[in-house]
Amino acid sequence: TIVFIEYRKIRKEKKIEYLIDRIRERAEDSGNESEGDTGELAKLVEMGDFDPWVGDNL
């Protein structure tokens, strides 16, 4: 149903936001980004029509 689709979309967006925050924190602490987190983030962004750089998703 539509509710389930929206729920999955929100969960995916929250997971992406969490990974972005982790990458930022690690970059501030160590001066570089975590390879594992950036790879996982790339997989999540590629898995659907979610485009974090368009509109107010940024």
Curated annotation (Swiss-Prot):
Positions where Phosphoserine occurs in the chain: 30, 34
One Pfam family recorded for the sequence: Vpu
UniProtKB keywords: AIDS, Apoptosis, Host membrane, Host-virus interaction, Ion channel, Ion transport, Membrane, Phosphoprotein, Transmembrane, Transport
Activity control mechanisms: Ion channel activity is inhibited by hexamethylene amiloride in vitro.
A GO BP entry: receptor catabolic process
A molecular function (GO) term: CD4 receptor binding
Post-translational modification, as annotated: Phosphorylated by host CK2. This phosphorylation is necessary for interaction with human BRCP and degradation of CD4.
One GO term describing the cellular component: membrane
Main location per the UniProt record: host cell
Protein localization: Host membrane
Record InterPro entries: Vpu (IPR008187), Vpu_cyt_dom_sf (IPR009032)
Membrane association type: Single-pass type I membrane protein
Keyword flag Membrane: yes
Gene3D superfamilies, alphabetized: HIV-1 VPU cytoplasmic domain (1.10.195.10)
Entry domain remark: The N-terminus and transmembrane domains are required for self-oligomerization and proper virion budding, whereas the cytoplasmic domain is required for CD4 degradation. The cytoplasmic domain is composed of 2 amphipathic alpha helix that form a U-shape.
Oligomer and partners: Homopentamer. Interacts with host CD4 and BRTC; these interactions induce proteasomal degradation of CD4. Interacts with host BST2; this interaction leads to the degradation of host BST2. Interacts with host FBXW11. Interacts with host AP1M1; this interaction plays a role in the mistrafficking and subsequent degradation of host BST2. Interacts with host RANBP2; this interaction allows Vpu to down-regulate host BLM sumoylation.
Function (record text): Enhances virion budding, by targeting human CD4 and Tetherin/BST2 to proteasome degradation. Degradation of CD4 prevents any unwanted premature interactions between viral Env and its receptor human CD4 in the endoplasmic reticulum. Degradation of antiretroviral protein Tetherin/BST2 is important for virion budding, as BST2 tethers new viral particles to the host cell membrane. Mechanistically, Vpu bridges either CD4 or BST2 to BTRC, a substrate recognition subunit of the Skp1/Cullin/F-box protein E3 ubiquitin ligase, induces their ubiquitination and subsequent proteasomal degradation.
Comment field (misc): HIV-1 lineages are divided in three main groups, M (for Major), O (for Outlier), and N (for New, or Non-M, Non-O). The vast majority of strains found worldwide belong to the group M. Group O seems to be endemic to and largely confined to Cameroon and neighboring countries in West Central Africa, where these viruses represent a small minority of HIV-1 strains. The group N is represented by a limited number of isolates from Cameroonian persons. The group M is further subdivided in 9 clades or subtypes (A to D, F to H, J and K).
Family statement drawn from the similarity comment of this UniProt entry: Belongs to the HIV-1 VPU protein family.
Protein name per its UniProtKB record: Protein Vpu
Species of origin: Human immunodeficiency virus type 1 group M subtype A (isolate Z321) (HIV-1)
Underlying gene: vpu
